[in-house]
Amino acid sequence: MKTNSIRRFIDKIKPNFTEGGKFAWLQSTFEAFETFAFTPNRVTKSGCHVRDAIDLKRTMIMVVIALVPAMLFGMWNIGYQTALHSTDWPYPLDGCHNVAALLYCLWFGFLRMLPMLAVSYIVGLSIEFAFAQIRHHEVNEGFLVTGFIIPMIVPVTTPLWQLALAVAFAVIIGKEVFGGTGMNFLNPALVARAFLFFAYPTRMSGDNVWIAADLWGTDAITGATPLGELAAGIRPTASALDMFIGTIPGSTCETSVIAIALGATLLLVTGIASWRIMLSVILGGGLMGLTFNVLSTLNLPQLSTLNPQLSTYIQLPFYYHYLMGGFAFGAVFMATDPVTAAQTNIGKWIYGLLIGIFAVMLRVINPAYPEGMMLAILLMNCFAPLIDHCVIARNIRMRQKRALVTSKASAK
């Protein structure tokens, strides 16, 4: 009954927003709200198309659902990391059976994340709506995912004004100047993170993150992440199990491999994300990690000139790279972006392998920035069209050769 009432109300005011109506200049904005509430009844007008039950809106919502486990765990981990160093936390952390402590950690993290999500969506959607009105285009649902991801991949104490600048930069420079959703060649969420990293490096260096020293963070300390400890030449104090679960300092929602794996399962089952890219990123990272493990047994003095802490890095078991930093999150939710990734099947393997290789290589060799996943994905975003071009050109040459052989055989 409520749905029918909303439908009738929308149909009643719709003439005001169509051509010739009082608010025709707001047609794009009206259509955005209408299509968000209901599936549009428009069909394609020309060309042959494959009918599919999943449109862009459902695809974006499915990705958001896949992000929910990482978001919920990230909220809880914000409260948990605060509780570990707080002097006035109201509930003891005496195990998973303490439901009150678990819920309070989740509530504490929710209160920290809510303003960041609000700023991300308000700023980003405002710019999206403005560009849609200027261009007289419909508002696409692409920012549903981007606005959700950006707060997940930055430190929880990123000032809201810095977050707003990063979102604006990502939407305008990373997407709209190239034509909007589907036309961008760089992942907008990573563009936002890159903006913060290069504009405010002390807050995005990847080695230390904020941990509250009292309940509301009026006094605070910083805690080293596993990657930060490695950058200092120290083996990570957290166990592999802790890093796998995610109970470690880090970016807001990137720490739990379990939560990320749940989202990856949903994306793979629904066919939204490419399993080739996910698997190849993992294989590339493992290959590079094993290569460094082999180099650690050779005792080459030349390697120490690249990074003074290199010996600690290269002796680290290769699978640790999957558990630290944003490797897992990037492999599942960033590298698989269908707009910025390679499109051909062979290209996806090449694209993913190079991301994994460069991510681990940048971590180990680059002493200035412990995390390399962001830079690796952005680099391969730039080369994805070239990879596809080379793969397609190779396929064309092979087909031409087969056609030539066939024609010669027929002539005989």
Regions found by a protein language model. Name each.
Residues 44-50, 124-135, 172-182, 262-270, ...:
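C-terminal ends of transmembrane helices
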Residues 179-261:
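Long hydrophobic alpha-helical segments that form multi-pass transmembrane helix bundles
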Residues 97, 116-130, 147, 167-175:
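Central hydrophobic cores of alpha-helical transmembrane segments in multi-pass inner-membrane proteins
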Residues 106-120, 157-166, 229, 243, ...:
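Structural signature of hydrophobic alpha-helical transmembrane segments
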Residues 1-117, 410-412:
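N-terminal signal-anchor module of multipass membrane proteins
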Residues 164, 185-190, 319-325, 348, ...:
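Loop-to-transmembrane alpha-helix initiation sites
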Residues 146-156, 261-267, 329-335:
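Generic transmembrane alpha-helix motif of multi-pass integral membrane proteins
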Residues 297, 302-312:
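Short, basic, low-complexity termini and linkers enriched in Ser/Thr/Gly/Pro
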